[in-house]
Amino acid sequence: MKVEICVDNLESVITANQFPIDRIELCSALAVGGLTPNLGFIQQAQQISTIPLALMIRPRAGDFLYSEDEIQIMLNDIATAKQLGIQAVVFGALSANGEIDLATTELLVKASQGMEITFHRAFDLCKDPITALEQLIDLGCHRILTSGQAATAFDGIPVIQQLVKQANGRIQVMAGCGVNADNVKQIIEQTKVPEIHFSAKGQRQSLMDSISSARMGTSSQDNVLDIADSQKIKGILKYISLL
Protein backbone atom coordinates (compact mmCIF):
# COMPACT_ATOMS: atom_id res chain seq x y z
CA MET A 1 0.00 0.00 0.00
CA LYS A 2 1.39 3.38 -1.05
CA VAL A 3 0.37 6.55 0.72
CA GLU A 4 0.29 10.06 -0.77
CA ILE A 5 -0.50 13.30 1.04
CA CYS A 6 -1.39 16.55 -0.72
CA VAL A 7 -0.11 19.80 0.77
CA ASP A 8 -0.06 23.48 -0.15
CA ASN A 9 2.38 24.96 2.35
CA LEU A 10 5.85 24.29 3.71
CA GLU A 11 4.64 23.67 7.25
CA SER A 12 2.67 20.69 5.94
CA VAL A 13 5.70 19.40 4.01
CA ILE A 14 7.67 19.42 7.26
CA THR A 15 4.85 17.62 9.08
CA ALA A 16 4.51 14.98 6.36
CA ASN A 17 8.22 14.19 6.58
CA GLN A 18 7.73 12.97 10.14
CA PHE A 19 5.75 9.98 8.87
CA PRO A 20 6.28 6.94 6.59
CA ILE A 21 4.58 8.53 3.60
CA ASP A 22 5.54 7.48 0.08
CA ARG A 23 4.84 10.66 -1.88
CA ILE A 24 3.89 14.29 -1.32
CA GLU A 25 1.70 16.01 -3.88
CA LEU A 26 2.85 19.61 -3.91
CA CYS A 27 0.15 22.17 -4.72
CA SER A 28 -1.01 25.65 -4.05
CA ALA A 29 -4.63 26.54 -3.25
CA LEU A 30 -5.99 23.20 -2.06
CA ALA A 31 -9.22 25.03 -1.29
CA VAL A 32 -9.95 25.03 -5.04
CA GLY A 33 -8.64 21.51 -5.63
CA GLY A 34 -4.97 22.38 -6.00
CA LEU A 35 -3.03 24.54 -8.46
CA THR A 36 0.60 24.61 -9.59
CA PRO A 37 2.78 25.86 -6.72
CA ASN A 38 5.31 28.64 -7.14
CA LEU A 39 8.99 28.01 -7.83
CA GLY A 40 10.23 29.17 -4.44
CA PHE A 41 7.91 26.77 -2.63
CA ILE A 42 8.96 23.87 -4.87
CA GLN A 43 12.66 24.51 -4.33
CA GLN A 44 12.33 24.87 -0.57
CA ALA A 45 10.23 21.71 -0.37
CA GLN A 46 12.98 19.88 -2.26
CA GLN A 47 15.53 21.14 0.25
CA ILE A 48 13.48 19.95 3.21
CA SER A 49 11.76 16.78 2.05
CA THR A 50 13.26 13.31 1.97
CA ILE A 51 9.94 12.07 0.56
CA PRO A 52 9.52 12.13 -3.25
CA LEU A 53 7.45 15.03 -4.58
CA ALA A 54 4.67 15.01 -7.16
CA LEU A 55 4.01 18.43 -8.68
CA MET A 56 0.49 19.57 -9.48
CA ILE A 57 0.28 20.96 -13.02
CA ARG A 58 -2.91 23.00 -13.09
CA PRO A 59 -2.73 26.62 -14.27
CA ARG A 60 -6.03 27.85 -12.85
CA ALA A 61 -9.10 26.92 -10.85
CA GLY A 62 -12.32 25.82 -12.51
CA ASP A 63 -12.85 23.28 -15.27
CA PHE A 64 -10.29 21.19 -17.14
CA LEU A 65 -10.99 22.45 -20.65
CA TYR A 66 -7.82 24.36 -21.53
CA SER A 67 -6.93 26.89 -24.21
CA GLU A 68 -3.74 26.63 -26.26
CA ASP A 69 -2.11 29.28 -24.09
CA GLU A 70 -3.05 27.41 -20.91
CA ILE A 71 -1.66 24.18 -22.35
CA GLN A 72 1.60 25.98 -23.04
CA ILE A 73 1.70 27.10 -19.40
CA MET A 74 1.33 23.46 -18.37
CA LEU A 75 4.11 22.40 -20.73
CA ASN A 76 6.34 25.15 -19.33
CA ASP A 77 5.66 23.98 -15.77
CA ILE A 78 6.37 20.35 -16.69
CA ALA A 79 9.68 21.44 -18.23
CA THR A 80 10.53 23.28 -15.01
CA ALA A 81 9.63 20.21 -12.95
CA LYS A 82 11.93 18.08 -15.08
CA GLN A 83 14.79 20.59 -14.76
CA LEU A 84 14.37 20.60 -10.98
CA GLY A 85 14.47 16.81 -10.79
CA ILE A 86 10.89 16.42 -9.57
CA GLN A 87 9.92 12.74 -9.48
CA ALA A 88 6.29 12.97 -10.61
CA VAL A 89 3.72 15.31 -12.15
CA VAL A 90 -0.04 15.45 -11.76
CA PHE A 91 -2.38 16.81 -14.43
CA GLY A 92 -5.65 16.30 -16.25
CA ALA A 93 -7.35 17.72 -19.34
CA LEU A 94 -10.85 17.14 -20.68
CA SER A 95 -12.76 17.95 -23.84
CA ALA A 96 -15.94 20.02 -23.83
CA ASN A 97 -18.09 16.88 -23.95
CA GLY A 98 -16.60 15.32 -20.82
CA GLU A 99 -14.07 12.98 -22.40
CA ILE A 100 -10.30 12.77 -21.96
CA ASP A 101 -8.67 15.42 -24.16
CA LEU A 102 -6.52 12.90 -25.98
CA ALA A 103 -4.40 15.36 -27.96
CA THR A 104 -3.58 17.55 -24.97
CA THR A 105 -2.95 14.61 -22.65
CA GLU A 106 -0.63 13.03 -25.21
CA LEU A 107 1.35 16.28 -25.39
CA LEU A 108 1.61 16.48 -21.61
CA VAL A 109 2.58 12.82 -21.27
CA LYS A 110 5.33 13.15 -23.88
CA ALA A 111 6.66 16.24 -22.13
CA SER A 112 6.69 14.33 -18.82
CA GLN A 113 8.82 11.40 -19.95
CA GLY A 114 11.21 10.37 -17.18
CA MET A 115 8.73 11.33 -14.46
CA GLU A 116 5.78 9.41 -13.05
CA ILE A 117 2.43 10.69 -14.31
CA THR A 118 -0.81 10.89 -12.36
CA PHE A 119 -4.04 11.89 -14.10
CA HIS A 120 -5.90 13.72 -11.34
CA ARG A 121 -9.57 13.93 -10.40
CA ALA A 122 -10.53 15.48 -13.70
CA PHE A 123 -11.09 11.76 -14.28
CA ASP A 124 -14.12 11.98 -12.00
CA LEU A 125 -15.79 14.38 -14.42
CA CYS A 126 -15.49 11.99 -17.38
CA LYS A 127 -18.85 10.80 -18.68
CA ASP A 128 -17.52 7.28 -19.30
CA PRO A 129 -14.90 6.23 -16.73
CA ILE A 130 -14.45 2.78 -18.24
CA THR A 131 -13.42 4.16 -21.62
CA ALA A 132 -11.41 6.95 -19.98
CA LEU A 133 -9.35 4.46 -17.98
CA GLU A 134 -8.42 2.50 -21.10
CA GLN A 135 -7.44 5.72 -22.87
CA LEU A 136 -5.17 6.77 -20.02
CA ILE A 137 -3.53 3.35 -20.01
CA ASP A 138 -2.90 3.65 -23.76
CA LEU A 139 -1.51 7.16 -23.33
CA GLY A 140 1.05 5.96 -20.78
CA CYS A 141 -0.21 7.44 -17.51
CA HIS A 142 1.05 5.60 -14.44
CA ARG A 143 -1.93 6.21 -12.15
CA ILE A 144 -5.25 7.94 -11.75
CA LEU A 145 -6.52 9.76 -8.69
CA THR A 146 -10.24 9.18 -8.26
CA SER A 147 -13.12 9.38 -5.83
CA GLY A 148 -15.05 6.95 -7.99
CA GLN A 149 -16.92 9.87 -9.58
CA ALA A 150 -18.60 10.57 -6.23
CA ALA A 151 -18.40 13.39 -3.70
CA THR A 152 -15.94 11.33 -1.63
CA ALA A 153 -13.92 8.16 -2.12
CA PHE A 154 -16.07 6.44 0.49
CA ASP A 155 -19.21 7.22 -1.51
CA GLY A 156 -17.44 6.08 -4.68
CA ILE A 157 -16.38 2.65 -3.39
CA PRO A 158 -18.42 0.67 -5.97
CA VAL A 159 -16.92 2.54 -8.94
CA ILE A 160 -13.38 2.48 -7.51
CA GLN A 161 -13.75 -1.26 -6.98
CA GLN A 162 -14.74 -1.66 -10.62
CA LEU A 163 -11.83 0.50 -11.82
CA VAL A 164 -9.28 -1.51 -9.82
CA LYS A 165 -10.56 -4.74 -11.37
CA GLN A 166 -10.51 -3.22 -14.85
CA ALA A 167 -7.01 -1.80 -14.42
CA ASN A 168 -5.66 -5.20 -13.36
CA GLY A 169 -2.26 -3.70 -12.60
CA ARG A 170 -1.90 -1.91 -15.95
CA ILE A 171 -2.32 1.45 -14.21
CA GLN A 172 -2.44 2.27 -10.51
CA VAL A 173 -5.78 3.40 -9.11
CA MET A 174 -5.34 5.79 -6.19
CA ALA A 175 -8.41 6.56 -4.08
CA GLY A 176 -8.72 10.09 -2.76
CA CYS A 177 -11.11 12.80 -1.53
CA GLY A 178 -12.50 12.75 1.97
CA VAL A 179 -10.22 9.92 3.11
CA ASN A 180 -9.83 9.86 6.90
CA ALA A 181 -9.20 7.53 9.83
CA ASP A 182 -12.88 6.62 10.02
CA ASN A 183 -13.19 5.33 6.46
CA VAL A 184 -9.73 4.48 5.12
CA LYS A 185 -9.83 0.84 6.24
CA GLN A 186 -13.19 0.24 4.59
CA ILE A 187 -12.16 2.02 1.37
CA ILE A 188 -9.01 -0.08 1.03
CA GLU A 189 -10.59 -3.39 2.01
CA GLN A 190 -13.59 -3.02 -0.28
CA THR A 191 -11.86 -1.54 -3.33
CA LYS A 192 -8.43 -3.23 -3.11
CA VAL A 193 -6.77 0.01 -4.23
CA PRO A 194 -2.96 -0.15 -4.15
CA GLU A 195 -2.62 3.55 -3.28
CA ILE A 196 -4.44 6.04 -1.06
CA HIS A 197 -4.42 9.87 -1.15
CA PHE A 198 -5.43 12.34 1.55
CA SER A 199 -4.79 15.83 2.91
CA ALA A 200 -5.31 15.21 6.66
CA LYS A 201 -6.55 18.78 6.74
CA GLY A 202 -6.49 20.61 10.03
CA GLN A 203 -6.30 24.23 11.07
CA ARG A 204 -4.30 26.39 13.39
CA GLN A 205 -4.69 29.95 14.51
CA SER A 206 -2.39 32.63 13.17
CA LEU A 207 0.56 33.45 15.43
CA MET A 208 0.10 37.17 14.83
CA ASP A 209 -0.64 39.24 17.93
CA SER A 210 -3.51 41.10 16.31
CA ILE A 211 -5.56 40.72 13.16
CA SER A 212 -7.02 43.68 11.28
CA SER A 213 -10.63 43.66 10.13
CA ALA A 214 -9.30 43.95 6.56
CA ARG A 215 -9.62 40.82 4.44
CA MET A 216 -7.27 39.54 1.75
CA GLY A 217 -9.97 37.84 -0.33
CA THR A 218 -13.38 36.23 -0.04
CA SER A 219 -12.48 34.20 3.05
CA SER A 220 -13.29 35.52 6.50
CA GLN A 221 -10.66 33.15 7.93
CA ASP A 222 -7.44 35.09 7.35
CA ASN A 223 -6.50 34.38 10.96
CA VAL A 224 -6.71 30.60 10.43
CA LEU A 225 -4.23 28.51 8.44
CA ASP A 226 -5.07 25.18 6.82
CA ILE A 227 -2.33 22.64 7.53
CA ALA A 228 -1.71 18.91 7.51
CA ASP A 229 -2.74 17.68 10.97
CA SER A 230 -0.23 15.24 12.45
CA GLN A 231 -2.87 13.53 14.57
CA LYS A 232 -5.05 12.93 11.52
CA ILE A 233 -2.07 11.52 9.63
CA LYS A 234 -1.34 9.19 12.56
CA GLY A 235 -4.95 8.04 12.60
CA ILE A 236 -4.97 7.20 8.90
CA LEU A 237 -1.60 5.45 8.96
CA LYS A 238 -2.59 3.45 12.03
CA TYR A 239 -5.46 1.82 10.16
CA ILE A 240 -3.39 1.26 7.03
CA SER A 241 -0.70 -0.50 9.09
CA LEU A 242 -3.30 -2.97 10.38
CA LEU A 243 -4.27 -4.15 6.89
From Swiss-Prot:
HAMAP family: CutC
Gene, per the UniProt record: cutC
Molecular-function annotations in GO: copper ion binding
Species lineage: Bacteria, Pseudomonadati, Pseudomonadota, Gammaproteobacteria, Pasteurellales
Similarity section: Belongs to the CutC family.
PANTHER family reported in the protein's UniProt record: COPPER HOMEOSTASIS PROTEIN CUTC, COPPER HOMEOSTASIS PROTEIN CUTC HOMOLOG
Domain of life: Bacteria
Listed name of the protein: PF03932 family protein CutC
InterPro entries: CutC-like, CutC-like_dom_sf
Pfam families per the UniProt record, alphabetical: CutC
GO CC annotations, alphabetized: cytoplasm
Subcellular location, record wording: Cytoplasm
Keyword Transmembrane attached: no
Keywords: Cytoplasm
